[in-house]
Regions:
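Alpha-helical segment of the N-proximal tetratricopeptide repeat
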Residues: 35-68
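Short coil turns that delineate tetratricopeptide repeat
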Residues: 70, 104-105, 139
């Protein structure tokens, strides 16, 4: 293999995470000497930009190279990899198919990444056929076989799940929550009161995380503003949960001077003027020398669910629960057990207002390839059902974060890098399917008066 051929191989190896093709002994390539010299120079510049993850500039240069050399197959393959890296799977599939049409000698080498892009568009049947073709290719190495078999199991799971959970008339249609809430910065970790009229979420600006609040007024969300009080600091506050009645705010504070571990749980209380008290560390009963995050209060504020890396669990990060004692203190946390937790990581728990449906994410349960969203139902005080994957397209082949569900049991909110995003992660709302929704929860709003004083 000459120097230029190794260069092309290096380029595409960088783009595809698995880098399996760099180990194939029988890969065949175009003769670089027959490629337009200027196009090849532009392609080399694009490679340097890809190394620096300057994908926008890289894509521009790849397009320029194609104008000079319309049948430059490596450009299509490389661009397919970049599109996959930025999660534009439809364009990735299109470029793969164009390259394969031009020269089928490449198809055996690129069947595995092609299958991943197909899965990214939800074409799991075709992805399975493609990965099986790859596994039948002579001479592939053990690393490639292992990666392909893993992907095969994912595609088989997706096909089986779709058969067992027919969508019927259900349509997954995430709706961006608009400019009142979303900006060119990152918005994530939404939290909602039971009446659905107040949302608090995390916004990250220049790597600084703070809490913002928006109120639903006459059906429209107000422009989100930083929460008042002493909660937002020059440190990082995130992964918050507002109590169903809107009176408590529990959140994650990392690297605080008074912190016990790397990230601790803190609580603040609503004041009469609408602000928040100075946050209090929940103390060494809940917080450990390790990592605690993603709190979620039960509707009666008696149970606190959270994720932790403390010892005594099943994997790296598990979901735990602490019960509030009669004296108001939080009790020693209890691991939710092997039905919920795995030898992988579980996080972002959300206990619904029905006090039974627990939504969370995990990379340890079988799913679509990365971190997926699941729901488990409380059977009794210490037992949970086997988690149900929320399915495609709520879950994708990429990482999913947190999800919350409104009191109606169906309306859900989550953060996503959707095509309608203002920039990076935005907050979206959508409706859950019947089989994964929570129970509709009724609530009553009122005031309590003293019978004698009327106060």
């Amino acid at each position: 293999m000459n120097k230029s051929s190794r260069f092309y191989l290096k380029f595409i190896s960088f783009i595809f995470i698995l880098q399996f093709h760099s180990l194939l002994s029988d890969a065949q390539w175009y003769d670089p000497e027959k490629v337009n010299k200027k196009a090849r120079e532009i392609y080399e510049s694009a490679y340097e930009e890809a190394v620096q993850r300057k994908f926008t500039e890289c894509l521009v240069h790849l397009e320029e190279a194609l104008k000079l050399e319309p049948k430059f197959v490596e450009v299509y393959l490389s661009r397919a990899g970049i599109y996959a890296d930025i999660k534009n799977y439809p364009l990735s599939v299109k470029d793969f198919e164009t390259a394969f049409t031009m020269d089928s000698v490449f198809s055996d080498t690129y069947l595995l990444p092609f299958s991943i892009s197909l899965a990214g568009t939800g074409q799991f049947d075709k992805a399975l056929l493609t990965v099986n073709r790859f596994l039948a290719t002579p001479g592939i190495n053990d690393r490639s076989i292992k990666a392909a078999n893993y992907r095969k199991s994912v595609y088989e799971f997706a096909i089986k799940y779709a058969a067992q959970h027919p969508a019927g008339k259900y349509i997954f249609a995430p709706e961006n929550m608009g400019d009142s809430i979303n900006t060119s910065d990152l918005e994530y970790f939404p939290s909602l009161t039971i009446d659905g009229k107040k949302m608090i979420f995390t916004r990250r600006i220049n790597n600084d995380e703070d809490f913002y609040e928006s109120n639903l007024i006459n059906g429209t969300w107000s422009k989100a503003l930083p929460v008042t009080g002493k909660i937002n600091t020059n440190l990082n506050e995130g992964a918050q949960n507002i109590s169903q009645d809107g009176q408590w705010l529990i959140f994650t504070g990392c690297n605080y001077p008074e912190g016990i571990g790397s990230c601790d749980l803190y609580i603040a209380y609503k004041t009469k003027n609408g602000g928040w008290t100075e946050p209090e560390n929940l103390g060494p009963t809940v917080n450990t020398d390790f990592w605690e995050s993603s709190p979620s209060l039960s509707p009666d504020k008696k149970d606190l669910y959270f994720a932790s890396s403390q010892p005594g669990g099943f994997g790296g990060k598990d979901i735990w629960v602490s019960h509030r004692q009669p004296n108001g203190k939080w009790g020693r946390p209890r691991n939710l057990g092997a039905d919920v937790n795995t030898d992988g990581d579980e996080g972002c728990p959300f206990i619904h207002a029905d006090n039974r449906s627990l939504y969370f994410n995990s990379n340890g349960h079988m799913g679509y390839g990365m971190t997926d969203l699941y729901v488990s139902r409380k059977l009794d005080d210490s037992t949970w059902s086997t988690p149900d994957n929320l399915g495609y397209p709520i879950n994708t082949i990429d990482d999913e974060g947190s999800l919350i569900v409104a009191s109606d049991g169906r309306t859900s909110y989550y953060a996503s890098e959707g095509l309608a995003s203002r920039g990076g992660l935005d907050l979206y709302r959508f409706q859950l399917r019947d089989d994964i929704k929570a129970a509709k929860t009724l609530w009553v709003k009122g005031r309590v008066f003293d019978k004698k004083t009327k106060a």
